[in-house]
Structure formats: structure tokens, C-alpha cells
Amino acid sequence: MVEITEVIEPEWQTRNDIQNLVNQKTLQWVFVGGKGGVGKTTISSSIATALAETRESVLLLSTDPAHSLSDAFGQKFTHEPRLVNGFTNLYAMELNTSQIIDGLDGLRETHSFLKNVPDILMMLPGIDEALSFVELMQSVQSRRFSVTIFDTAPTGHTLKFLKLPDVLEKILDSLLKLENTMGGLLQLFSSMTKAQMSQNELFDKIKLLGDMINTTHEQMKNPDLTTFICVCIPEFLSVYETERLIQDLAKSEIDCSYIIVNQVLKHIQLGGLIEDAWDGLTEEQQRIMTPFFEKVREHHSTHNSRVDVQRKYLSDIKDLYQEDFNIVAVHQNKQEVRGKDALVAFAKKLMQHSPLPI
């Protein structure tokens, strides 16, 4: 009698596509980041078009000061969500965090979240940036999009951006610990501002603000709600920054399970085609065509040398991440990816099985 053993598939398996990402209906925040020039905007825009196929409403938001969303879609975007041409449920906006910081005072007069920020807190160094992040997340969430994709700034700015809730949470925790010992002093400082308040009222506001920030922070650390996609190219600096980014995301407890390796080159195999073509020419033709054939050989050699360099870093990426990450390889496009049709086509590539070519 043959014994039948039940085969149990593991709950989570790595893939070489973004199928699971697109099908994960619980996701609310998708951050796309990496070194400058690796194609983050193309990737984030393409993912947004794919999510628009499965989600009720999608917001694509650029926080990179050097905005490129308008170029990617061939449509002007501003700091307010605007419907992307050709879609009924995909919106895009370009926003600098500095714009939020500059407008904090005005927003505090009208926004329920910022009304709870005591004047004394605005004196703390770095508080404006931290509040701008929480204000951004609260504002986006209030618009009730099913999912928001962030096209982020280069790595260094992104890491600072993502650490802001943690920074603000620690500041408020420190203030709350001073409630008994320095409450009177804080109240004295508070009395010097526009809005005077009692010690209890001051700390009640700090606690309420802390609860709001804690909620945002917990959402950021919940892999069912938030994930980060690293985009890189197979070059030293990009791979180095990707490792740095992954390490920092791990320290911040932010889920990162996708790495998209962009601009991967293919080997050009000419074999004996050049020699056969050369041998088929007369001496006169060879004399005329010599410069052309030399250029072909030079470009062929240069291209394949670049491919060999890329293969080294592709191998490093595979060794470092293949067991724990969904790694998607995207070959170098012949043309710029611009406009709805090109972005949708690019998204289809990301949805297909695309392992590293090594």
C-alpha cells in the first residue's frame, strides 16, 4: 500500500514578480525608494496603474523635490490629487514636505489634528518636519483612498522621512515623563505663547497628539498595511545604498520584501556573424567598410563588458536577498517609459515571472 503524505506549502514564498503585492488587498501604504536615477518614478507609476486594476481608488504621491510624475504621465500634477488621464480611479499629486512645513501655522487654525499641537511644542527643534510627516499621512488617510503609493526622494532623504514619526514619538514621550517634575516650568513657557493653558490641559493635548502619532507609527510597522519596495540597478553604489536602506528599514520595523532590479542589460551574441559578413565582402568593400566594422566590434565589446560588470552585482544581489525577498529583474527599455500605455506595458513586465538572469 502506497503511503500518501500531505504536502503543505509554506505560508509565504518568494516570487520574481509583484503579483502578491497587487493582490494584497490590505495594503494602504506602498513606498518606492532607492538611489537617484534608478527609475523609481517609472516603477511607482507602473505599480500604481497595476493597483488601479484591482483597487477601488489609488493615489500616487511624489515626495521627491525633483518631481517626475508629470513627465511620466505627460500630464501636469500639483499638490492636490488630480485624476490621471485615461483612468477613473487613479489620482496623482506632487508634494514637497517643505510646503507642509511652511503652511503648518495656517493649517493649525483649521485642521483637527494640528489644532491639538500646543504652541510650546512648535519651539522644539525638528518638530516642524516631524509634524509635517504626520500631517501628510493624516491628510492622505482622510481622503479615503484604498491605497497610496509614495514615489520617494533618494535614499538619504527617504530614511529621514520615514524616521520622523519615531523621532516625534520619542520627543513626546520625553515630555510626558517630565509631567510631574517639570510641569510647572512647561506651563510657564506655555503662558508665554499665544494660547495659555493649564498644566493638565497642556499634557492632555500632548497625550492626544502622542496617540495620533502612535497610530501612524503602528500603521507604518504593520506589514499588512505598509510595505517598502527597493529599486536598484546592478551597479556598486546602487547595491550599496540598497543594503543600507534595507538595514535601516529593518531597524525601523518597516516591511520590505520586494527588490526591483531595473535597467538590466542582455548579452549580445553575435558569434561569427561579423566575420562571416566581413569575409563576404570584396577587398574594395572591405576597405570602405573597415571603420564601420571596427565600430561594431568596439560597441559589442563595450556592451558585453558592461553586462559582465552587471552580472557581478546581480550575483551579489542574488546571494544577499534571494531567500527573503521577491526579486524582480527588469531589462533595459529601448525607449523612455512615458505615458499611460507605456506605463501599463511596463507594469505587465513587473507582473510576469522575471528572475535575475544569472
UniProtKB/Swiss-Prot annotation:
InterPro entries assigned to the protein according to its UniProt record, in alphabetical order: Anion-transp_ATPase-like_dom, ATPase_ArsA/GET3, ATPase_ArsA/GET3_euk, P-loop_NTPase
Gene3D superfamilies per the UniProt record, alphabetical: P-loop containing nucleotide triphosphate hydrolases
Intracellular or extracellular location(s): Cytoplasm; Endoplasmic reticulum
Chief site of localization: cytoplasm
Class of enzymatic activity (EC top level): hydrolase
GO cellular component: GET complex
Catalytic residue positions: D64
Pfam families named among the record's database cross-references: ArsA_ATPase (PF02374)
Residues annotated as binding ATP: K35, G36, G37, V38, G39, K40, T41, T42, E235, N262
GO biological processes: tail-anchored membrane protein insertion into ER membrane
Keywords, sorted A to Z: ATP-binding, Cytoplasm, Endoplasmic reticulum, Hydrolase, Nucleotide-binding, Transport
Superkingdom of the source species: Eukaryota
EC nos: 3.6.-.-
Subunit structure: Homodimer.
Family of the protein in this entry: Belongs to the arsA ATPase family.
Function: ATPase required for the post-translational delivery of tail-anchored (TA) proteins to the endoplasmic reticulum. Recognizes and selectively binds the transmembrane domain of TA proteins in the cytosol. This complex then targets to the endoplasmic reticulum by membrane-bound receptors, where the tail-anchored protein is released for insertion. This process is regulated by ATP binding and hydrolysis. ATP binding drives the homodimer towards the closed dimer state, facilitating recognition of newly synthesized TA membrane proteins. ATP hydrolysis is required for insertion.
Protein name as annotated: ATPase ASNA1 homolog
The species this protein was found in: Babesia bovis
Taxonomic classification: Eukaryota, Sar, Alveolata, Apicomplexa, Aconoidasida
